[in-house]
Amino acid sequence: LKKITPEDGFHEIIIFNSGKYFIDSFSSLKVPKKILIKSLPNGELVHSIDETDLNQFVNYEWAFPKIVSFPSRDGKVNLDGKIIFPPDFDSSRRYPVIIHGYGMPGTQIVKNQWSRVWHQYLAQNGFIVFSMDSRGMGGRGEDFKNYSYGDISKYLAEDHLAGIDFLISS
């Protein structure tokens, strides 16, 4: 196998019916969305459809998220979280925390992808924004996703409590 999307981040691919080209729509924690047309089989850039200008965010004190990992309460798995701190964050101060939880099977919140504008707005207004993936969510393999099979709520609350434990201990 040869990787043909070398750019860091989360990629969504659409292959043309001809099989000769594909659209690569991607972003990362530090790079806003880009949409490119690339050729197959080598991934060579053919055309840039759209590229978000990072400079437009300078006046907004865009806070880059940090991906973290912490143990579940039962110690069976490590869970992933994403934290956005206020731009002027001072570790000696206390801040209100907004927890963005979802937890539906097969979905994934924590990924190397440009963050939501709403979360940035909250951070710029003095909130710490914490998102996490509980057991049963996607992007971590079939075994991790199947934790919620037959009982979606079994780990959801416990895993979110582990996230809160992590925040308190940090």
Predicted features along the sequence, with ranges:
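Serine-hydrolase catalytic core recognition
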Residues: 5, 12-170
